[in-house]
Amino acid sequence: MSRVIVIGGAGQGRQVIDAIVARGHHEVVGVLDRSFRRGDVVAGFPVLGTDDDLRAAALETAADSFVVAIGDNFTRGRILERETGAAAHLHPATVVHPAATVARDASLGAGCILLAGAVVGNGCRIGRGVLLGINSSVDHDGWVDDHASLAPNAATGGTVRIGRNTAVGLGASVIHEVTIGADTVVGAGAVVLGNLPDRVVAFGVPAKVVRDREPGEPYLQRR
């Protein structure tokens, strides 16, 4: 059984810990989060330091894997790419809740997270560090690029392309054969009927671009 360190101890981190425990393929040995003090406890597991302490914490606990359980796509991707390969004995763990469904011919990238009820259809490709929230779904032949996310109850039709670092918000829907660019945010409840470019924010039914955005800009802020 792999021994895993969870980076991120807030709400998303606790959900990921529950998924790991429920699946039983990894043993959680500790949490890294700069919002806590070393020795604090998150979801029953000790805080070992901050995300800067991964290699030291891995040596301390004999961990051989890690998962970045942070909701913000840009931050999650930055940490995952920084730490991948930094130590030969550490690799990014892929976490799939036992209540998630993955088609036999779908592929999952290293470090991705599928929470309870997430569905990945036939022929889908899910990139590195992707986060699929509770009850989200990617229909057949979809492609979700590295570090993108679908929030709870977000859904895509078949053959949809979601760009790197892009966030599809709570309950949003994307119809079939649509392409959404990189670093874009689709607001909660939006219905995307056509392609969206890189680095924009889109809201509404149907979804319309309301402004440009910068890569790394916090996407949970208001318009």
Q: PLM features: what roles do these ranges have?
A:
Residues G8, F66, P92, D139-H140:
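Generic structural signal for conserved hydrophobic packing positions in ordered secondary structure
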Residues R38-T101:
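Phosphate-bearing ligand-interacting subdomains
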Residues Q12, G71-F74, K208:
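Short glycine-rich anion-binding loops that position phosphate/pyrophosphate groups of nucleotides
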Residues I17-A19, R78-R82, I126-G127, P197-D198, ...:
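Short amphipathic alpha-helical segments
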Residues M1-F45, D51, R55-A58, L90:
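Hydrophobic, well-ordered beta-alpha structural blocks that scaffold small-molecule cofactor pockets
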Residues T94-F203, A207-V210:
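Structural signal for interior beta-strand "rungs" in well-ordered beta-sheet cores
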Residues A22-R23, E83-A86, A148, P218-L220:
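Glycine-rich, phosphate-binding/catalytic loops in enzymes
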Residues V205-R223:
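…primarily DNA-binding HTH/wHTH and HhH modules…
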